[in-house]
């Protein structure tokens, strides 16, 4: 009488097939994880740039106190969260441009404050060599890699 169950060869073949399928799926999992981080990077850059532009518009329309020679861009990212006083308002209400500074999803150290995970470009620095300065004209990621589209992350 034949015993019921799997033979050793059937188990080995099954394990081998599962191993091949798993190894074929791993690159797809990594690719999807990278795609998700890149999507988050796009969204974070858009949020920050929109807040910087809103601050600049408020400054240009006379709602933000500026000194002679100021560019009208925020002095740092934290100002966008902390807010500035609307000098045209009789009640001196505060204007806020961000709820919080988003983290750079490509930044490797989770212990660093979110505002410090971004590279800052001042209004006076050229696009080819972004440098921090008296204001924040633009932000960029400090990641060195290239995206799935072949463009360096720093150029996004």
Residue ranges and their predicted role:
Residues 19, 26, 34, 91-94, ...:
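Preference for short coil/turn "hinge" residues that link or interrupt alpha-helices
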Residues 33-60, 72:
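Membrane-proximal N-terminal amphipathic helix
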Residues 53-156:
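Low-complexity, acidic interaction segments enriched in glycine
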Residues 29, 36, 65-68:
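Conserved short-loop catalytic and cofactor-binding motifs
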Residues 2-29:
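N-terminal single-pass transmembrane signal-anchor helix
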């Amino acid at each position: 009488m034949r015993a019921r169950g799997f033979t050793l060869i059937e188990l080995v073949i099954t394990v081998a097939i599962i191993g091949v399928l798993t190894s074929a799926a791993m690159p797809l999992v990594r690719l999807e994880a990278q795609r998700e981080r890149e999507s988050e990077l796009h969204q974070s850059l858009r949020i920050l740039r929109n807040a910087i532009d809103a601050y600049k518009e408020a400054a240009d329309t006379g709602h933000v106190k500026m000194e002679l020679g100021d560019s009208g861009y925020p002095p740092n990212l934290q100002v966008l969260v902390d807010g500035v006083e609307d000098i045209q308002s009789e009640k001196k209400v505060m204007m806020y441009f961000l709820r919080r500074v988003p983290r750079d999803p490509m930044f490797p150290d989770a212990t660093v404050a979110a505002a410090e995970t971004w590279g800052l470009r001042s209004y006076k620095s050229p696009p080819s060599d972004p440098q921090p300065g008296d204001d924040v004209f633009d932000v960029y990621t400090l990641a060195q890699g290239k995206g799935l589209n072949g463009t360096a992350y720093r150029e996004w």
